[in-house]
Amino acid sequence: MNAVTDLKQDYLVADISLAGWGRKEIAIAETEMPGLMAIRDEFAAAQPLKGARIAGSLHMTIQTAVLIETLKALGADVRWASCNIFSTQDHAAAAIAAGGTPVFAFKGESLKEYWDFTHRIFDWVDGGTPNMILDDGGDATLLLHLGAKAEKDASLIANPGSEEETFLFAAIKEKLAKDPSWYSRNLAAIRGVTEETTTGVHRLYQMAQKGDLKFPAINVNDSVTKSKFDNLYGCRESLVDGIKRATDVMIAGKIAIVAGYGDVGKGSAQALRALSAQVWVTEIDPICALQAAMEGYRVVTMDYAAEHGDIFVTCTGNYHVITHDHMARMKDQAIVCNIGHFDNEIDIASIEKYEWDEIKPQVDHVKFPDGKKIIILAKGRLVNLGCATGHPSYVMSSSFANQTIAQIELWQERDSGKYPVGVYTLPKHLDEKVARLQLRKLNAQLTELTEQQAAYIGVKKEGPYKADHYRY
């Protein structure tokens, strides 16, 4: 699909005429997002984000549209791009653009377009800069930090090590040629970032450890009501949705290999087992491996599993978990996909030399020299968003309620000294607040402690109920 832009408008989407359809789905999603909508209702009058200019880099879906409109309802000015080339829902992007929010996203972007769009979320039409980032995977944060370094040392962007870096480095060089101080100027204006996902959080901690991070960050991913719900229950529903839409395969009876048994892997394994697959798990961490074994999954290595599996799902956040040699040994018609954030969990670059036959968008047959074919979904990128529509609205409500609270927290405390440069998590009482708001939709009835019971276990009657180190 060719992207369409109206030069009189500050947006770029696939088809603005899809806005009506998108608006109808947004209205439905709002009814399934109780936590986020309650936050909107609670804070709308106070306008706690007034003055915030948020550069957003997160999957441009229907659920994200509800997040964007919540941020705006609380006073923020917002510009948006997707954090994945395949994850945009074009009708969602159209609805947001039609509503007056600058959005630069369409399904099936090239990598050149992706990095161009990520730059555009920092270019306010009045010539100003954003002062907050809402990130998913850390690309927006990375862009400013790397670009600012490259202003002083061009060698940092001289030798790309991957296709992704080739386009990223080229985009930075192009921007520097036009405006040599663009990155440092934008970087200096940012008061904080809230990060959505595990991969982006890893990047933040690495940057902080090296002393490279230039502004405070809130790790939204490790809020319990994000990681233990979005990552687990969201993947439990959206993984199989993506595989089914892409292939129409019967999962029952198949051997399914789940690489990684963190929260995403746990949800993925549950989903595949629920449809009667034989689920095998690969793990490096003995604790996670023991958890998998105690749940009845067979724990194996990828070297062993490669020639046995029918469906392969990577969820590790690591690099080359499935290699060329693994794929060369797979069965004919094996299905290979990823539900981790980046596309390098599967070594796609190593098989690009072979014949690719597109069955339909984001579904490819790759023919090996011996004539065997395997099915690659979403070119190794997020299968649930590339081949389906991602997590359900209800579970995203928890994640995005946390995002909104984190944006409010950083913006309100920007001058207080509460958050010097570093990586932080939201306090337990806010986690519990999000859970309470979500429970309303399910007609759940919480038991209340008596004063005596609260005193007996040493907590306040209204919570928080667990210590920060508690593992849910």
Swiss-Prot record:
Compartments (UniProt record): Cytoplasm
GO biological process: L-homocysteine biosynthetic process; one-carbon metabolic process; S-adenosylmethionine cycle
Known catalytic reactions: S-adenosyl-L-homocysteine + H2O = L-homocysteine + adenosine
Record-linked CDD domains: SAHH
Tagged with keyword Amino-acid biosynthesis: no
Alphabetically ordered keywords of this record: Cytoplasm, Hydrolase, NAD, One-carbon metabolism
Family: Belongs to the adenosylhomocysteinase family.
Function: May play a key role in the regulation of the intracellular concentration of adenosylhomocysteine.
Name of protein: Adenosylhomocysteinase
Organism: Cupriavidus pinatubonensis (strain JMP 134 / LMG 1197)
Lineage of origin: Bacteria, Pseudomonadati, Pseudomonadota, Betaproteobacteria, Burkholderiales
